[in-house]
Swiss-Prot record:
GO biological process: negative regulation of translation; translation
Name the UniProt record assigns to this protein: Large ribosomal subunit protein uL13
Transmembrane intervals: none
UniProt xrefs under Pfam families: Ribosomal_L13 (PF00572)
Xref: PROSITE patterns: RIBOSOMAL_L13
DNA repair as UniProt keyword: no
Function: This protein is one of the early assembly proteins of the 50S ribosomal subunit, although it is not seen to bind rRNA by itself. It is important during the early stages of 50S assembly.
Key word Ribosomal protein present: yes
Keywords: Ribonucleoprotein, Ribosomal protein
Ranges in coiled-coil conformation: none
Gene Ontology molecular function: mRNA binding; structural constituent of ribosome
Family statement: Belongs to the universal ribosomal protein uL13 family.
Summary of subunit composition and partner proteins: Part of the 50S ribosomal subunit.
Length: 142
């Protein structure tokens, strides 16, 4: 018996919508990364993007445990000398709540072209509205 290998043109991708209200950031991100990769499917193949599209709503209402709301730091560099910037979780949620989930999930995906293709299937929105109704997403309870 031969080993099954999924082909990119035959992979069936579904659309799912997830409500992040009250969900713990890391636990939510691991499940999102798993589904973006396609590891929940029987036809999973490591070198083929077999994952589904995920829409995350209410990113501003995601929860963290302990003192992470004030202690967790996010860093980025502007590219200029001495241009390291930092922001706490609270500041990130106030400024760009979508980025918190995007950063958490992106760190759990493979690095390289395949990981970038998987990351592009993640759509995160701060509020309760999204513009993907035409794709008829199914509600995914995590």
């Amino acid at each position: 018996m031969k080993t099954f290998t999924a082909k990119p043109e035959t992979v069936k991708r579904d659309w799912y919508v997830v409500d992040a209200t009250g969900k713990t950031l890391g636990r939510l991100a691991t499940e999102l990364a798993r589904r973006l990769r396609g590891k929940h499917k029987a036809e999973y193949t490591p070198h083929v993007d077999t994952g589904d599209y995920i829409i995350v709503l209410n990113a501003e209402k995601v929860a963290v445990t302990g003192n992470k709301r004030s202690d967790k730091m996010y860093y980025h560099h502007t590219g200029h000398i001495g241009g390291i910037k930092e922001a706490t979780f609270e500041e990130m949620i106030a400024r760009r709540p979508e980025r918190v989930i995007e950063i958490a999930v992106k760190g759990m995906l493979p690095k390289g072209p395949l990981g970038r293709a998987m990351y592009r299937k993640l759509k995160v929105y701060a509020g309760n509205e999204h513009n993907h109704a035409a794709q008829q997403p199914q509600v995914l309870d995590i």
